[in-house]
Amino acid sequence: MSKEVSEEGKTHHGKDYVDPPPAPLLDMGELKSWSFYRALIAEFIATLLFLYVTVATVIGHKKQTGPCDGVGLLGIAWAFGGMIFVLVYCTAGISGGHINPAVTFGLFLARKVSLVRALGYMIAQCLGAICGVGFVKAFMKTPYNTLGGGANTVADGYSKGTALGAEIIGTFVLVYTVFSATDPKRSARDSHIPVLAPLPIGFAVFMVHLATIPITGTGINPARSFGAAVIYNNEKAWDDQWIFWVGPFLGALAAAAYHQYILRASAIKALGSFRSNATN
């Protein structure tokens, strides 16, 4: 997209931002870089902290018996959204602040990260999630074991198809927000206000939780669902686990395609470039 400025009868064409080059599909050189392993550590710790705070909030809420006790659904949604805001702000400059395999998958499809980095991030995120929920169980063992362990399952009264649809749409909202908040044009314009990228991402997580907690407990993050399932180790949590991988990955795929090929018209630009080269 070009920026046109007319001044004194002259028209100047030029971008006020630079599109980063696409990441290589397979960059084995990253395995020799300390910055790659530093990013893996950042993703591991961020996901650990995310799961610890959020699952502890869920268990603490369920532990209360009075109708006005605990933080309620609104407080749980704030815990998830608020932690994403904080952790993305803290880690964006190191790893990009993904904290979610679905986000990593979407960015990989858009050629923002290489396959090596994407796989490394997903492994680090899942391990961090397991450790984070493990800390919750260690500190709150009795309520953790009796109150669902913070695991994602399909709620009574909802079909698996409905739950899958909720996860697809919820993850679409999140990943679409990530693409929009980190768009090079927006980043160039808002670079003097560093909180403007993490804020809408955290708020998107908050809003999606309000909508989907009654259906699935809100996954939209395969690492979050996997970590809780591993530590809680409940049959229903494992039976429903596929929903919290397939749904988020399909949602991320749809968001990446929508942003890259419709909003940013990457396919049309590539076709135009091909035609231009063919005529020269």
UniProtKB/Swiss-Prot annotation:
Transmembrane regions listed in the UniProt entry: 39-59, 70-90, 119-139, 161-181, 193-213, 243-263
Residues bearing the modification Phosphoserine: 273, 276
Tissue specificity: Highly expressed in flowers, expressed at low levels in siliques, and at low level in leaves and roots. Highly levels in elongating cells in both roots and shoots.
Protein name (database record): Aquaporin PIP2-7
Record topological domains on the Extracellular side: 60-69, 140-160, 214-242
Domain of life from the UniProt record: Eukaryota
Keyword set includes Transcription: no
UniProt free text on domains: Aquaporins contain two tandem repeats each containing three membrane-spanning domains and a pore-forming loop with the signature motif Asn-Pro-Ala (NPA).
Quaternary organization: Interacts with SYP61 and SYP121 in trafficking vesicles and at the plasma membrane.
InterPro entries to which the protein is assigned, alphabetical: Aquaporin-like, Aquaporin_transptr, MIP, MIP_CS
Cell compartments where the protein resides: Cell membrane
Annotated motif NPA 1, positions: 100-102
Lineage, broadest ranks: Eukaryota, Viridiplantae, Streptophyta, Embryophyta, Tracheophyta
Sequence positions bearing Phosphothreonine: 279
Keywords, alphabetical: Acetylation, Cell membrane, Membrane, Methylation, Phosphoprotein, Repeat, Transmembrane, Transmembrane helix, Transport
GO molecular function, one term: mRNA binding
